[in-house]
């Protein structure tokens, strides 16, 4: 009996223990009215989360452990943005935090700009999430690291807020500079900026070099300089822009909308420079359109000019300037619309690329007419006094700012060349291997093709007339050689002194041994003449340019100074001939030697294979080429020095278009700092790095083929 009662008691204990275990493992079901206020709110939030799929309550993020983990994860995110983006995608798949507002049902186009930017950027989204709940925000020591993160650059500021259309139009209307003034002041500012940068880097080089600092010292310096970084960003060197308040021209960072938005405190210095470069392209186009419109309204459409000029003369003088004006107006309108979309400019090179490919052919037509335009203008000034007086009267109008009529006629050619340089300026500042870099490279390539077509159009017109004029002046003593050819043009012409007679009779007293001869050097032919009365030239020898060899004589006294030997491996009589020629100066001798037979070791060497530490100069005074072998210089041009003479001439290569030629050294100043020279070369390599390899290979093959034929 007692045994049975003990068994029943044991069963009862087991049953109560089992019931107690089940009760502990079941979810607590408590009535809401019995809960305190805080617990009731938590229960309501829990009910909302139960209705939403894949939701969870966030953990306590403000603990010491989680803050340390968060720092490490942010550092990894900065080093590997792709992984950060994938982690963000996974977290969005798993669910949203209760502290994050649900915006999935809001259309993308109607979302607030700041929210759109923050959702686009993982770092900005995390910053918003952490700062939305008290106690879960990022600590102050984390803010500098977050501000320096690459994710807070353009990606985080893609959608700030648009500039009002009226505000932007007022800005365009307030640009009081004509393009001629804008261009001159802009290039002068660029020269001055390079001088300052050269001086700053040179001062830093004279001090303790940064490369000698240890990593720990560099980190300490970065930490010390970090709080003062926002003021330094505002005092960045201005790039190619006008900062004179009297010019009624503003920088991008000086716009009221930019200053009030606070983006200058968020954007990195390189991004601000990029914004300034894109802003300069837009505002310079507005200034160019203003000057072009003045050419049409003030000069071309003047009733008195229409009465004086014949329709054919007016057509040659103004060409298709109306087409150029229409393209510029549409181009500027699209740039304005892009500026109105956002105070932080996303890109402008895509618009430049589209117009360069589809619409800028009007520039080729206008510029190709430049030779006839200049000649017609000179003839009208000489032959029609009424036209000359009227132009002088119109130039005195305050609208023209004292600028001559000829400066308005060359506006399209100046603009298309300057536009390519502005795109280069943007290309130097965009992120490498980014979409904006690809767009800038495409735009630059299209503009380069347009500029080359313009140059070829001008050269073709002038070369044809020049060859016809030379052909009329030549009389052949030997077998006649056809001069006029579509593939032939003049490289250099001039007078030299030939030393004749046997070597034993070449004494310093027999000055009659020197005879004057005249040389015409074409790109594929050398013609040696004697000048005869009547402005004629008698040809007595010729040879293909590829069969010429030159040799400089050693210094043999004042009389034989500047003397070199010219060898014709096969002349007009199919024989070898040698000429000892004397030039008037050392520079003239070197220029003839360079033109007659370029250094065959460097003639076919590509630009990128040259020495990095090459002497460089920048143009500080414009120079117009006087001879075919000279190079026309524009302000702020950077050139590599390939050769120079003691009497002040330099043979150089311009970096932005790789054109070669001679120019006076007084027009330039040397860049002494090697860091600046290296930076200029690196920027040049980056601009030209995306050239078509197949095209370059075919070009090199053609050059090598021509060398073999020579």
Curated annotation (Swiss-Prot):
Segments of this protein annotated with the region Regulatory region: 1-273
One Pfam family in the UniProt entry: RhoGEF
Modified sites of kind Phosphotyrosine: 179
The record's account of how the chain is modified after translation: Src-dependent phosphorylation at Tyr-179 upon EPHA4 activation increases the guanine exchange factor activity toward RHOA. Phosphorylation by CDK5 upon EPHA4 activation by EFNA1 may regulate dendritic spine morphogenesis.
Keywords: Cell projection, Cytoplasm, Developmental protein, Differentiation, Guanine-nucleotide releasing factor, Membrane, Neurogenesis, Phosphoprotein, SH3 domain
Gene3D superfamilies: Dbl homology (DH) domain (1.20.900.10), Pleckstrin-homology domain (PH domain)/Phosphotyrosine-binding domain (PTB) (2.30.29.30), SH3 Domains (2.30.30.40)
SUPFAM superfamilies in the cross-refs: DBL homology domain (DH-domain), PH domain-like, SH3-domain
Bias-annotated ranges (Basic and acidic residues): 1-11, 26-41, 687-699
PANTHER family per record: EPHEXIN-1, GUANINE NUCLEOTIDE EXCHANGE FACTOR
Name of the protein this chain belongs to: Ephexin-1
Organism: Homo sapiens
